[in-house]
Amino acid sequence: MVHLAKYIVVTGGVVSSIGKGITAASIGRILRSYGLSVTAIKIDPYLNWDSGTLNPYQHGEVFVTDDGMETDLDLGHYERFLDSDLPGEANITTGKVYMSVINKERSGDYLGSCVQIIPHITDEIKSMIRKIADKSGAEVVLVEVGGTVGDIEGQPFLEALRQLRNEEGHENVMFVHVTYVPYLRAAGEFKTKPTQHSTKELRSTGINPDMIICRSEMPIDSSLKRKIAHFCDVEEEAVVNAPDASSIYEVPLVLDSERVGDYIVRRIELDVDGEADLSEWAGIVESLMIDEPVVTVGIVGKYVELEDSYISIREALKHAAAHLRVRVDIEWISADDAVNEEDLSRLDSILIPGGFGERGIAGKLEAVRFALENRVPIFGICLGMQCMVIEFARLNGMEGANSTEFDPETPYPVIDMMEEQKRIKNMGGTMRLGSYQCRIREGTLAHEAYGTELVGERHRHRFELNNEFREELESKGLIISGTSPDDFLVEMVEIKDHPWFLGCQFHPEFRSRPNRAHPLFVSFLRAALERSR
């Protein structure tokens, strides 16, 4: 039996970073509350094959999926809002599309045809979208088109999606256009002209939006909605206002109050019983809005100027705080600078996130030393764990201990590149990526947090604790609390006689959800709360 999905395509206009990803994720959350199965796709119109080699300052965090793909951070939003694990193929890039088409041409699949944008590229885009829809078995497929309408890079994707609507039927595909309605304080009024022009640009591609979601700093009134409906040729009830919210998790509630779910259900003829029920989600949002007690976490990182570089860590801390019914305040501390001990002393806890390269390592090591000497709860993730091992070794007689990533000639290479990684020359998609199992040692902080002996966590690294120094480090007091099931790779470390000192080689933040806070983050914040008291 052929799987027939309904498609909701989300495009953006006027400005970039308008919140298309949160909008798409919020629509998905609303549809989930009807009892519908939903999956999501992010289209990134850049020529990179994936997000793995992109600069965090330009693109934000690289989100790693269970199956080991390095993807756009919007997939993290989708997973958190939909509470489901997405495949890496749900991130479609121009690079993937072109590579697939060129490989097919080289293998003779096109039988000598002149390979063109239309039909070959557009057919490949549609094929990728349908493949994801079929494999997921979802009733609704959300497709977010990255960038802004009018970008030259996005034109083949918009054409493919226009064709998709014709082929699937207008009752099975709808377009949601997210725009910005600026407020001019000098004139004291909102301006709809940018939205009108953006919609006109979209219509010039052959796509008429079914719904327009207007982002704004403040709520807009019904007369403005009528004006936009009139000039943009959509129904008045399909003009939706999404003003700035205090939390991204409020957006599904805002859109639901605008009857977005009801309109979508009617527009693409979804088979549902009853109304959307977001009561559980509203409870989560209420927990996220708690004002006190407050715990302070200092994140010592090298990309702190752009918070999106650590977006999953930030959200995981919020989820854990909501679980404990506390508020978390995050202090962003640049590891590039000499870490000020006075600043650190005001913190309830310290978190050292992942990263690559030598820049900022000295600052991270200073933070580890401060946490050890002052008994401050500290959580190290990926490179953060490696820094904890390095500083622990140095403080316990292994002078000059380091990672071979930073000092190939170190006398104590306590962190070294994994053996199988040493033969790899290409950078893209070649690390230890995706979900791997970790066996947890009983009687440890990790076991207390997880409450189980075997867990699956997502990884993204080339370097590991060097087994040649494992026995020596353990003799000095380092506890290996988690390893690969074969006991070969060290996954987690702790020490005794410290309130909370734990490092993990994996990225637990990728598994945290608003309704299911990650146990390590909950345990970490609980220790921070104890210190704050």
Curated annotation (Swiss-Prot):
GO biological process, one term: 'de novo' CTP biosynthetic process
Keyword line: ATP-binding, Glutamine amidotransferase, Ligase, Magnesium, Metal-binding, Nucleotide-binding, Pyrimidine biosynthesis
Binding-site residues, CTP: S16, D151, I152, E153, K191, T192, K193, P194, T195, Q196, K227
Catalysed reactions, semicolon-separated: UTP + L-glutamine + ATP + H2O = CTP + L-glutamate + ADP + phosphate + 2 H(+); L-glutamine + H2O = L-glutamate + NH4(+); UTP + NH4(+) + ATP = CTP + ADP + phosphate + 2 H(+)
An MF annotation (GO) of this entry: glutaminase activity
Binding site for Mg(2+): D74, E144
EC number: 6.3.4.2
Residue ranges, annotated region (Amidoligase domain): 1-270
SUPFAM superfamilies according to UniProt: Class I glutamine amidotransferase-like (SSF52317), P-loop containing nucleoside triphosphate hydrolases (SSF52540)
Positions contributing to L-glutamine binding: Y57, G355, L383, G384, M385, Q386, E405, R462
One Gene Ontology term, aspect cellular component: cytosol
Residues reported in the UniProt entry to bind ATP: S17, I18, G19, K20, G21, I22, D74
Activity regulation comment: Allosterically activated by GTP, when glutamine is the substrate; GTP has no effect on the reaction when ammonia is the substrate. The allosteric effector GTP functions by stabilizing the protein conformation that binds the tetrahedral intermediate(s) formed during glutamine hydrolysis. Inhibited by the product CTP, via allosteric rather than competitive inhibition.
Sequence positions that bind UTP: S16, K191, T192, K193, P194, T195, Q196, K227
Pathway assigned in UniProt: Pyrimidine metabolism; CTP biosynthesis via de novo pathway; CTP from UDP: step 2/2
Sequence similarity: Belongs to the CTP synthase family.
Assembly mode: Homotetramer.
Misc: CTPSs have evolved a hybrid strategy for distinguishing between UTP and CTP. The overlapping regions of the product feedback inhibitory and substrate sites recognize a common feature in both compounds, the triphosphate moiety. To differentiate isosteric substrate and product pyrimidine rings, an additional pocket far from the expected kinase/ligase catalytic site, specifically recognizes the cytosine and ribose portions of the product inhibitor.
Task performed by this protein: Catalyzes the ATP-dependent amination of UTP to CTP with either L-glutamine or ammonia as the source of nitrogen. Regulates intracellular CTP levels through interactions with the four ribonucleotide triphosphates.
NCBIfam families: PRK05380.1, PyrG
Protein name as it appears in the record: CTP synthase
